[in-house]
Amino acid sequence: GFLTAEEKGLVNGLWGKVNVDEVGGEALGRLLVVYPWTQRFFQSFGDLSSADAIMHNSKVKAHGKKVLNSFSDGLKHVDDLKGTFAKLSELHCDKLHVDPENFKLLGNVLVCVLAHHFGKEFTPQVQAAYQKVVAGVASALAHRYH
């Protein structure tokens, strides 16, 4: 596996305290605010006219929750991310034509949100482990492009 046993422990230890629904909506919302060009994939989501509108948009929250539940699933199969995300990779790459760079951006935003929520608990070691995970997930999602 690409994570050491210690890194897995750090990742799972923190993940057990994550409110997946809340953090998912916040991460996706921030992605759309901070990197506005990502909004073009969400035109059917209604009002994305301001940061406030985005952060309170129920469709953004719902999709963010879905995204983070998939991520949660990935953490259970961290040694087979390609397999775990094969179907989602197909959907996002072949059908939706999402630029794979966006998966990396969302991963980095997720790390920011976790740091924001957990403060001192989000140590450099924990961050390093999470950066590895989000990079692995982004790469698994971009798999169909390679």
Swiss-Prot record:
SUPFAM superfamilies tied to this protein: Globin-like (SSF46458)
Tissue-level expression: Red blood cells.
Modified residues (N6-acetyllysine): 59, 82
Keyword terms, alphabetized: Acetylation, Heme, Iron, Metal-binding, Oxygen transport, Phosphoprotein, S-nitrosylation, Transport
Modified residues (Phosphoserine): 44
Binding, heme b: 63, 92
Entry's Gene Ontology BP terms: hydrogen peroxide catabolic process
Subunit structure: Heterotetramer of two alpha chains and two beta chains.
Name the UniProt record assigns to this protein: Hemoglobin subunit beta
Record lineage: Eukaryota, Metazoa, Chordata, Craniata, Vertebrata
